[in-house]
Amino acid sequence: MAAYGVNFESANSIKSRKESKREERERVIQKAKEKFEKEERRKAERKARGEDTWMLPDVDLRLQQIGEEHTVKTKKAKKEKKAKKSKKEKKKKAKKEKKDEGDASCDSSEDSEDEWVEATLPSGGKDKSLEGEPEATPSSSSASNNQRDEWMTFDFLAMKTTSVADRRAQKEAEKEAERQKAQAIEQAGLHRLELNPYWKDGGSGLPPEESSSTAVKKAGVVNDGGVSWLRKSYQRMKEQADREQRSLDSVVAERYGSMEEFQKRLKEAEDAAYGERRDDEKERGRREEGKESWRRNDREEGRERWRRDEEKDRWRRNDRDEGRERWRREDGDEEKERWRKDGWRRGENEDRRRERSPNAERERARSRDDLSSKFLKPSEDEEVSRGAGFKKGSSSNQSAAFRKPVDDVEMSREAGFKKGSSSNQNAAFRKPVDDEMSRGTAFKKGSSSNQSAAFRKPVDGDHDDDEMSRGAEFRKSSSSNQSAAFRKPIDNNNDGRGVAAAWRKSSAVQDSETPTLQKHTEKSAALQEDSKTTTTVSSSESEEEEEEELILTDEEMNKLGAKIVKAEIMGNTALLEKLRAQMEAARRAKEKRAQIKDQSKRASKPAVSEKEVLLFRTDPSGRAWPVNAPSETLEPRGGRRKRKAIETHQDGERVRYFDDDDGVDLREMVRREKMSSAEDQNALYSRMAAKMMGRTDGDNYTLDDMFVSSAAQKERAGRDEERQRNKAVQETRRLAGRMEKCPHCFDSAELPKHLIIAVGTKVYLCLPNSVSLTEGHCLIVPVQHHTAATGLDEDIWGEIQMFRRALVRMFESQELDCVFLETHMNPKRHLHMVYECVPMPRELGDMAPIYFKKAIMESDEEWAMNKKVVDLSKRDIRQAVPRGLPYFSVDFGLQGGFAHVIENEQKFPHYFGKEILGGMLDLEPRRWRKPIRENFDDQRKKVLKFAQWWKPFDCTKSDS
């Protein structure tokens, strides 16, 4: 029978899949190679034509002037900075010199004073009088000129000072004195015949708190003291480590600090929980020993009585059963033990198959027909029942399935055969009955389930039917809840004879049988695992090689983990070690495979240099603000963590809706209102709806109740900040990618420099990179990356208006009118702002306002939130449309125009203004729907012609 959990695949299918994958890879590589070669060829052609270097001489001169101005400004700024620095240093130097001079003068005056005092001669009165005059003169002059402040003459050494420690010690001494005084008063009030022992000898009158502390200690151990919880936590941490491909120590360190800390807690909990139970278990073991001899004798008597009853039945007179009885008498326990160890490997089943009676084949066919409805695949229910049996440990039932391999009919019907203890191993047989259902239920599960029922000899493919019938019978027996019973088989004819004497429960484990049982269990479990993990019966060395090379899937890893848990529950150390070795080998193979993939990816991809970027969010009005750093540690993800409910009502009144209502003030609410958008509200709505959708039980009767209940659940710590950071990262990456490929940024490599006509300080004038709508079609573009006119600074807007006036004058000289268009759609894409100028004849220019107003009124949604047409005759677009809204604007020459706030961007085309102009000028639709590219020569002619028109009206030269 095929091994459970192993998928087979032919070599041809593997080879074909590899071949198709190889062909697909080659196809992708060839396509990328062709694309790369095409781009390189196009670049070479552009370079050969001079497309990447050619530009107007005036533009080149202007760029040189800008570069010189920049260098001059830089040099000037450096010079000013240097001058300021030198000036500051000079001031410092002068101050220092002045200070040194003052110090030197003071020192010299003191020195001179000292020298003058030493030079006095106490010889005559005349000298004394002369000596007194110079002393009085400088003192009086210094007193008059340099009168010192009071704090300068204050004697700080004479001031009394106290430290903090002294003050603290003084306060403690005062408190101690008060305490002693109160105690003396209490002692004075006591009588010499006081009976309270806790108050008599200076006590407080109350007993010590030892009893309360011991009570607390005793109450600390509830049930198992948290041992099961810690073990369950350890199992979940192992599952999380397997799921996230991390080491177990790191997962344990996240929750408990370190593995040593967790083991310490577990040991303390086990000592607290099981320390007092060990003595009880020893006493219970001594009581169980007294019952063993009675159970053994009682079981032997029951078996002999059952055998005597069996001899009276007529089924033993059948030839088929005589052969089975002969095998039981002749071979005995020694032959069965030898078969259990190695008989099935040498093929002894073939020798015994010759001893079958002539009726065996007929009985086998009949049993297969009767059991055809019960041919089921052995499921994991057998393993579960076996696990319970090992845990409870019945010696008689656990060894019941170590049987001699007889013919397939006997194996499919022999449910009553049991192997006894190590001292008594006589086999018990059941009478085969015609009713297969009674035969299936005759073998009942006891308090310990029949663990070794599936530990059978591997059979060939022609015996699959018998194997499946045996699996069905054992599944039926393992699902039973009755105690294990040796019952007498019944006949269909014997209605009055019920089940024979049922035997007692076998829940207690006999100490004399435990070593033998454990040995049988470990060997049988190992045989079962080998039969499940191998596809054919092969040697153990080939199995180990296959396991080392095998890379298990997640589902197979989960099943293997379940087997490990079952082995831990059963206490089967040998099987547990083997399964753990398999798990470690599978993990190592998986990690090795992941490392190989990472190395291949690193080798294929070029090294990316890391750079620090300031993360910021942009509000709908275009203002940007940096993202705050995490204020608290983010809780780990993974696992099943139930969200905690917050307290929303107090005394029947609602006090909060969300978990962070207490930490939000008015300023924070205003900030959120200004900085959040409708998309943020929609995202919050969808998150709350997704978690509560489908759960309308309990308090959630309506949709509103669902949202209220979801809002009252506490979110994971730091989750909102993590969400803001992820959004900021996405916006930064999107903006960086857009600016890198922007064809209008002045410092971008995608900018067609040969189409530039004039360059100002903040704005430049260029021609479109495709076929123009009309001759003279041009673009006014900001130098820096700005997305809309509503977010421009005053100096940029002023320079755009300067270019606009110059273009109007230029086209007026040619008796032409002009229309200025701007379309700002999808603010998230951060498209560069383009202000287009399209010339047209004057008679059409006079009719243009009518065309545009009618088209705007009929465009977009029928029911709009904003005004359909916004008049720009008395104000510009920056004052008429709020920042952050998508809009379309049109201006007619130097007059005002119209603006329209776009309600539905899917219905509003990006070529709306060009389409109206194309209809007025009767142009073909491909001019504005999908613009036609021009070659370099046509573009150069167009640029030279427009430069001649622009030269007399160049506002950049007059401005410079």
Curated annotation (Swiss-Prot):
Domain of life: Eukaryota
Claim: Coiled coil is one of the keywords in the record: yes
Sequence ranges of Acidic residues compositional bias: 108-117, 541-552
Biased composition (Basic residues): 73-96
Region span, Disordered: 1-222, 261-552, 624-648, 712-731
Coiled coil stretches, renumbered: 13-101, 163-279, 540-605
InterPro entries xrefs: Cwf19-like, Cwf19-like_C_dom-1, Cwf19-like_C_dom-2, HIT-like_sf
GO BP annotations, alphabetical order: mRNA splicing, via spliceosome
PANTHER family in UniProt: CWF19, CELL CYCLE CONTROL PROTEIN, CWF19-LIKE PROTEIN 2
Protein name: CWF19-like protein 2
Organism, scientific name: Danio rerio (Zebrafish)
Upper taxonomic lineage: Eukaryota, Metazoa, Chordata, Craniata, Vertebrata
